[in-house]
Swiss-Prot record:
Domain of life: Bacteria
Job of this protein: GTPase that associates with the 50S ribosomal subunit and may have a role during protein synthesis or ribosome biogenesis.
Binding-site positions, Mg(2+): S215, T235
GO molecular function: GTP binding; GTPase activity; metal ion binding; ribosome binding
A Pfam family per the record: GTP-bdg_M
Keywords associated with the record: Cytoplasm, GTP-binding, Magnesium, Metal-binding, Nucleotide-binding
Any one Gene Ontology cellular component term annotated for this protein: cytoplasm
Subunit (UniProt): Monomer. Associates with the 50S ribosomal subunit.
Protein's UniProt name: GTPase HflX
Record: residues binding GTP: 208-215, 233-237, 255-258, 321-324, 345-347
Gene: hflX
Annotated compartments: Cytoplasm
Domain Hflx-type G per the UniProt entry, residue ranges: 202-367
Protein family according to the UniProt entry: Belongs to the TRAFAC class OBG-HflX-like GTPase superfamily. HflX GTPase family.
């Protein structure tokens, strides 16, 4: 990955102008590539749209275009050419030779960002696995970057052709080892998650296109210092915090990695565990930047990924963010009329209270509310309810303490069974 102590590499960004795609659409793709490249730490020196009737098997772009690019790269002292397309290993290798510069395709660039953003041990291993699987057929790449603390695709290249056979063997061995380690991590996570599944906190996951404002909204709701900046993929590993709701009650809220259009399928599979909180959530908040002219396309992109994760049937509330940037509220009013939608500004706080109220109603529909009466002297069971239920209200009496709690049906049954077996003086009364 790019080293922070070095000056950023100067890059030229290349987008193919294909016959069936409008120039405006291609320009939007190029604009997105600018954001991706900046996030990866590159200095964007130039961007260029190149007409392409059909991809050339050897170099992707035509020979005349490649020659012109080579001259420009030499004159402008450009270090990296970023191609907004998935290149074959042969195309990438040939382009690097002809351009005399490092060539990175879309998949490699996204991997570079993931590598820089991974926080947990599991996230780092997932990045490394995805990078290695990407590199397997790119024989000029070296495995030496794997010795770094975080994996990446290595924008600065490797030691050369004589390493190819060694690379093949080392990469195969490392992939096998990583898969075994990740299987063990997944088993451990399943065991660690089991106690939390018994805690009746309603789980909500923030999802959305990159830069939709998820982390900013997460910070506002939780007052947590999660990395929130104007860069794509600002959160790679899910971060969870408890959020207090109006009228009592709590939820577990998770902030997750943003999705993008044309995310390579192999990356979705490699990062599936990173999105585990999405797959296990009781509810999704789909955060949409309504001020972006391309917001409808982004919604389609996110919905496509959710379908791949098989969570499209999870109850979803669409949160239209950045409404403070709208020139007219007409579009917001139209979308709010569809239902299961709400408008907010994570920047100004507008709409956050109604959002919390909506979450409160969702919790109320999913959880059971009970009045629990127990002796004041029974500190163990008092602590147990605080640990294993969402305590909405506490009323202290002379001899008894009364709790209003919310909990899942399975947890209620388990606690009632424990009370009966132990013969303790605890009463349960449903609250309408």
């Amino acid at each position: 990955m790019l080293e922070t102590h070095q000056a950023p590499d100067r890059a030229i960004l290349l987008q193919a102008l294909e016959p069936k795609v409008t120039r405006d659409a291609c320009q939007r793709l190029l604009d997105e590539l600018v954001h991706l490249s900046t996030t990866a730490g590159l200095e964007v020196h130039a961007t260029q749209l190149l007409s392409l009737q059909k991809a050339v098997p050897a170099t992707y772009f035509g020979s005349g275009q490649v020659e012109e690019l080579a001259r420009r790269i030499e004159e402008d002292e450009i270090d990296v050419a970023v191609v907004n397309h998935a290149l074959t290993p042969i195309q990438q290798r040939n382009l690097e030779k002809k351009l005399n510069a490092k060539v990175v395709d879309r998949t490699g660039l996204i991997l570079e960002i993931f590598a820089a953003r991974a926080r947990t041990r599991e996230g780092i291993m997932q990045v490394e696995l995805a990078s290695l699987m990407y590199q397997q057929s790119r024989l000029v790449r070296s495995w030496t970057h794997l010795e770094r603390q975080r994996g990446g695709v290595g924008l600065r290249g490797g030691p050369g052709e004589r390493q190819i056979e060694v690379d093949r063997r080392l990469i195969r061995e490392r992939i096998h080892k990583l898969k075994k380690q990740l299987e063990e991590v997944e088993r451990t996570r399943a065991l660690q998650r089991q106690p939390r599944q018994d805690i009746p906190l309603f789980t909500v996951a923030l999802v959305g296109y990159t830069n939709a404002g998820k982390s900013t909204l997460f910070n506002l709701l939780t007052r947590a210092g999660v990395l929130a900046e104007d860069k794509l993929f600002a959160t790679l590993d899910p971060t969870m915090r408890a959020v207090d709701l109006p009228d009592g009650g709590r939820i577990l809220l998770s902030d997750t990695v943003g999705f993008i259009r044309q995310l390579p399928h192999q990356l979705v599979a490699a990062f599936k565990a990173t999105l585990e909180e999405v797959m296990s959530a009781d509810m999704l908040l789909h955060v949409v930047d309504l001020s972006d002219p391309e917001w409808e396309r982004y919604v389609e992109s996110v919905n496509g990924v959710l379908q791949e994760l098989e969570v499209q049937h999870t109850r979803t509330l669409t949160v239209y963010n950045k409404i403070d940037r709208l020139e007219s509220r007409g579009i917001l009013e139209r979308e709010l009329a569809r239902g299961d939608t709400i408008g907010v500004s994570a920047q100004t706080g507008e709409g956050v209270e109604p959002l919390l109220s909506e979450l409160r109603r969702a919790v109320g529909r999913a959880m059971l509310r009970y009045e629990v009466i127990l002796p004041v002297s029974d500190g163990r069971w008092l602590a147990k309810f605080h640990a294993e239920a969402s305590v909405v209200e506490v009323r202290e009496g002379e001899d008894f303490t009364t709790l209003i709690v919310e909990l899942a049906p399975a947890v209620l049954g388990r606690l009632q069974g424990e009370v009966e077996r132990e013969g303790v003086e605890v009463q349960f009364r449903p609250v309408d």
